[in-house]
């Protein structure tokens, strides 16, 4: 057996083996709860801390003291890979001698020396093995992958030289994705910085003739926009936008449905320039600026905002921190905080003249366009990698 896509200098069949045969030890973290210490320096990690090949520590990561850490014997080395096996399944990370304590949702795989560690890391991402692992999951609410399944995982493996060649090639693809992701993060940070400067009026534009624009005026949202305008009769068929359809300003899902099959929440008939504001969990900021042709209807989970001002400026103003903080202050509920249309409409916004609105909207739109281009490049690179993983492994 050998893969569809192969470097020409290699031939011969790959060998069927198991992960256990290629490892010195496979185990998981502690099943007990350690004694947490807010002033502790050692992170207690779980599967969610395994991100894109590294251990990612965040503000929610529990910590323990050095004394607590000494109670547990973890046999890890530079030959160790981590795999998440409980709750979050399939996350991977290299161990780089960080001082961390493993929770039970982290499986450690100590590989033998005659293997390319990066090859095994990539192999475990392949569609073939991902499908196999997912088929072996147990549990209903919280999924679990047993250590026995991990140990007995079967796959075909080439000689070490071919492993290294494959790993080197695919690592270059990963590096490209990483560079694009970093660029995306930096542009997103730049946009946030620009929004802060623009909406705090730290940065002001001038009119085309060089004159100063008038001072901004404070107005309630309902005074500058119509909230949830009454819709005419809905069309017999339309594209439905619900709360799952939009993520960070991007329309990801377009569901074409018939009126007779439409959910009761399908009520907001959209017109170009409308802004959709997410009223449930608004901190997610999955709002949408609608500028498409055709029949679209949105869920009542959104507030539909229609204005005669620059609607793109209003869209950005709804993402400004001061506005969002006020929205959250008026929300009710804990797990799913929500604001009603009446409370939303009474929140005040600082409004410049129309010409300055347009200048601000144009600057932020230009940044968004660059971010979208990079997002598409990242997605294309990920799809390319997925195709390579499909063809370069058995």
Q: Model regions: which residues?
A:
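A generic structural signal for residues embedded in beta-strands
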Residues: 83-84, 172, 178, 277-278, ...
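Short amphipathic coiled-coil heptad-repeat segments
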Residues: 1-11, 172, 177-218, 373-394
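Short coil/turn segments at secondary-structure boundaries
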Residues: 32-39, 59, 136, 234-240, ...
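Sequence-specific dsDNA recognition surfaces
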Residues: 20-33, 48-78, 222-233, 242-272
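A short glycine-rich beta-alpha junction/loop motif
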Residues: 3, 85, 100-107, 130, ...
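Short, surface-exposed secondary-structure boundary micro-motifs
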Residues: 87, 169, 281, 363-365
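Non-catalytic DNA-recognition/assembly elements of restriction-modification systems
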Residues: 4-29, 152, 207-231, 346, ...
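A short beta-sheet element
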Residues: 46-47, 57-127, 264-324, 338
């Amino acid at each position: 057996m050998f893969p569809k896509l192969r470097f020409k200098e290699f031939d011969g069949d790959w060998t069927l083996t198991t992960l256990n045969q290629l490892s010195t030890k496979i185990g998981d973290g502690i099943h007990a709860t350690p004694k947490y210490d807010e002033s502790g320096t050692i992170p207690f990690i779980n599967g969610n801390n395994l991100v894109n090949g590294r251990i990612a520590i965040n503000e929610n990561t529990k910590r323990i003291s050095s004394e607590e850490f000494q109670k547990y014997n973890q046999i890890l080395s530079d030959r160790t890979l981590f795999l998440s096996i409980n709750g979050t399944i399939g996350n991977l990370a290299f161990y780089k001698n960080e001082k961390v304590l493993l929770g039970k949702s982290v499986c450690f795989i100590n590989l033998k020396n005659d293997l390319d560690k990066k090859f095994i890391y990539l192999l475990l991402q392949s569609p073939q093995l991902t499908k196999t692992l997912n088929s072996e999951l147990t549990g209903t609410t919280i999924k679990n992958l047993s250590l026995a399944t991990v140990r007995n995982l079967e796959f075909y493996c080439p000689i070490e030289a071919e492993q290294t060649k494959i790993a080197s090639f695919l690592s270059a693809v990963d590096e490209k994705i990483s560079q694009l992701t970093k660029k995306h993060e930096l542009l997103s940070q730049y946009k946030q910085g620009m929004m802060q400067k623009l909406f705090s009026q730290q940065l002001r534009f001038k009119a085309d003739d060089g004159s100063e624009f008038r001072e901004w005026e404070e107005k309630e949202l309902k005074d500058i926009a119509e909230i949830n305008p009454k819709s005419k009769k809905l069309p017999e068929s339309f594209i439905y936008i619900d709360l799952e359809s939009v993520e960070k300003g991007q329309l990801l899902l377009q569901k074409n449905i018939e009126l007779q099959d439409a959910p009761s929440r399908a009520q907001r008939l959209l017109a170009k320039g409308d802004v959709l504001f997410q009223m449930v969990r608004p901190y997610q900021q999955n709002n949408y600026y609608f500028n498409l042709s055709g029949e679209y209807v949105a869920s009542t989970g959104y507030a539909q905002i229609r204005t005669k001002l620059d609607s793109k400026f209003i869209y950005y103003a709804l993402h400004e921190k001061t506005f969002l903080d006020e929205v959250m202050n008026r929300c009710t509920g804990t797990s799913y905080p929500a604001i009603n249309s009446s409370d939303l409409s009474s929140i005040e916004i600082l409004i410049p003249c129309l010409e300055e609105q347009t200048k601000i909207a144009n600057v932020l739109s230009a940044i968004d366009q660059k971010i979208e281009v990079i997002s598409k490049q990242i997605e294309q690179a990920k799809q390319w990698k997925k195709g390579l993983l499909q063809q370069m492994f058995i």
